[in-house]
Amino acid sequence: MKNTDEKISYLDLFFCPKQNLYTYLEIYKQYSPNEKAFTNLILYFIANVIAVSKESQLLVYQSGLFGEIASSINLSQDPIEDIDVKIFFLSQLSVSSIYENDIMFSLQLQKIYFDIILLREELLLRDEHRDITYILNNSLWGLANVSFCENDTFINNFIKFDIISYIINSNSKSQVVLNPSLKIIGNLLSNKEEFVNKIISPELFHYLIENICYKNNDISIKSIGLWAMSNIFSDENQQKYIFQYNLPDILNDLFELNFPPDSEIDKEIAFQIGKYIEISNDEAVVVLIKKYDICSLQKKMLEKYSYNLKNMCHIYKCHLIMTSLIGIVSKNGEGGKLAVEIFNKNGMTDLIERVILQCSNPIDNEYMKKKVEEIEKMGEIILDEYLSSDTRTISNDDNEDI
């Protein structure tokens, strides 16, 4: 066994951790399990390396260390400090291919994270002088990383242990808790439809709305909250929620906050507008237009993002807005007619012509180039088939209600 000075010299490796990952792994194997304090420190170093490197995550997984740590956790006997560093280490694993290809390991991790949440009071009583907040938070991150796994065991455990209620009733407003919590909810809502219907509740909507609008000014929290909410809307059965919670007004209020053009939040607003239109029947589209003035919001967003179609963020947002535009004007029935009439009156024709002109700018990135080509095609379809058409007009009586 090496002496303390030699062990301390290993800490110099921390200053270039990625290059020394193999050395970390060797050190851990050499000292484990006899010197827990030192190996906990090395495990903490490894966790920080893999947190920023997916390549390193795969390397550590292949070394067997993830499986070793997961199997070594004993929640009923391990000291809190040991549980803390082990859960932090495991929660940094985010490479989806590992979960997809190793179902047993995925289920093992899920059980650990579920057990920690269920045993939180017991863990707190074991050592009243130690804060278990980070253990709980890292367990949420771990669950967030595996929450996309579409297996019945995972879904049934969420329902059985009522993890959603635990998340919703958490008093924390910190990004540390909200980010993984909203990611879990979003992943679950994008899962099986029968599961979605089991967890949708007024409490869930209020939780999402509060975190999108009020509790936290962090743009990333608002963005991931909007993304999570968007996953609720998959078909006409969910259109009632749009109006029950006045969600279009929330989108408009958020857009009026004028977030920086490169932020994610306007992308999520544009995406959610498209979802509302996609799942709405004719009657609902009329409400979106007449009560919530959704056409004006679409125009304002297109005006903001149609000036620079060489910027990747602008291209994404413009593509989403154009998708929602073609979605609403192509609706059959009164809703589509109303949208065409409004866009013909509010200058949308000139705006879309400007968008098409912007599409002629050269783009280096092939993926973005394809997106711009799709924007141009959508613009031409809207102009040729809808806004320039004389066949889709509405009566003067209807016109007075717009």
Locate the predicted segments by residue.
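Elongated alpha-helical scaffolds that mediate protein-protein interactions in large eukaryotic proteins
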Residues: M1-Y22, T39, A51-G67, V95-Q110, ...
